[in-house]
Amino acid sequence: MLQVYNTLTRKKEVFKPLKEGEVSIYACGPTVYNMPHIGNYRTFLMADNIVRSLEYLGYKVKLVMNITDIDDKTIRDSKAAGMSLKDFTDKYTAEFFKGLDMLNIKRASAYPRATENIDSMIELTQKLIDKGMAYEKGGSVYYRISSFPDYGKLSKLDFDSIIIGASVDVDEYDKDNPRDFALLKTSTPEEIERGIYYESPWGKIRPGWHIECSVMAMNCFGPTLDMHLGGVDLIFPHHENEIAQSEGATGKPFACYWIHGEHLIVEGEKMSKSKGNVFTLPEIVGKYGGEVVRFMFLSVHYRKKLDYSDAFAENAKNNYLRLKETLENLEFSLESAENTDYPGDEEVLKILPELETQFREALEDDFNIPKALTVFKELSRTANKYLESEKNRHVLEKLYSLYRQFSDTLGLFSESGKKEIPTEVMRLVEEREAARKKKDWTVSDAIREKIKSLGYIVQDTKEGPNVKETE
């Protein structure tokens, strides 16, 4: 039975979808104004892990992740870059998708852009005005948070701390200073000159950040969805304001389960440009490889801070390579194994269902991926122990099938499989085998080094030489 930690109630709850067997998820995506750092991608990967886990558990999942392509930051930085807002945000949207591919993050069902949903934002704003929950001031439209008694229920904000009538124009502000926030902002003369405005009943405007997500989520799912995901930094004001806007307009719960991922820190400190410890994904992937970075993110539960360091990444790399080697050895052994019974077969076949149950239970425990990884490592140990003895093809197929189920659910080894070895390398392998048969170890070792210089290693097994690319 799946249990999910709900930020709204601050406890684990049994998950009950709105529609049996199906799950609707909205995840806050990137604000495309720069290269996303590794902390951003940890949150995007959290969404991917949740989707993969739900699919493994038998659910049909629809994930929608927005792209914020108009807000304070995109307008400010596109101007500094001397680019149009569209060209600027298109550039960083493309970088965002490249990063998803680096980490083998599956594509969401949809990636709506804020600029494609302006009409709906104007409609929602008008609805809130009609209900007395929003008002126009100086060409901008503000949400009256005192009109929503539940304001603060997600962030546990003290409603009495609200300053009645005070408003704020910036998208991000402190929880200790709750104010009426902007739904739509009057465009400045400079923004109008740059073409960054939309006609509305209140003049030339552009949207505030918070209304964008409310509209895109409801346009995709209707008034209520199963899960809303994001980083802990979005709980206030962003997600709090989403609830106020959406539930204020519809009178219905906006999201049943709010799921938030913790921060990524670097060697115990928060990432900041002044400390020089802000790393982009391409920097880290260039150093360790995309799947190693993914594995590193998998090793810490999404509700715990991930403390990044080179030592932590190196440890993740070593663990990843051991698991990958097991997969390659299974694939190699399957090529020559026959259906002959051997002692130990029954023991392995008995262990596999137990490991499958443990893996499932880990995912059902608030998407406990680190716990699932521990089960995966146990499967690897079981496989390696079996590979040391005589091998039954039927048992190997069972091992390989479960190994692949686990790795696919974790998003690992997507490019694995028997790769074509270059002809020159295979010729050298044959020459080395001939030297070994003659017990000419000097020639055999020299050929091994030549093969290594070409980027391959040779492992001598009972079944013959196993050739692999070096990492």
Swiss-Prot record:
- Superkingdom of the source species: Archaea
Q: How is the cofactor bound?
A: Binds 1 zinc ion per subunit.
Q: What reaction is this protein's catalytic activity?
A: tRNA(Cys) + L-cysteine + ATP = L-cysteinyl-tRNA(Cys) + AMP + diphosphate
Name the cofactor(s) required for activity, per the record: Zn(2+)
Instruction: Give GO cellular component annotations, separated by semicolons.
Output: cytoplasm
Give start-end ranges for motif 'KMSKS' region: 270-274
Q: Which UniProt keywords apply?
A: Aminoacyl-tRNA synthetase, ATP-binding, Cytoplasm, Ligase, Metal-binding, Nucleotide-binding, Protein biosynthesis, Zinc
Does Zinc appear among the keywords? Answer: yes
Q: Identify the residues that bind ATP.
A: 273
Ranges annotated as spanning the membrane = none
Name of the protein in its database record: Cysteine--tRNA ligase
Q: Which organism is it from?
A: Methanosarcina barkeri (strain Fusaro / DSM 804)
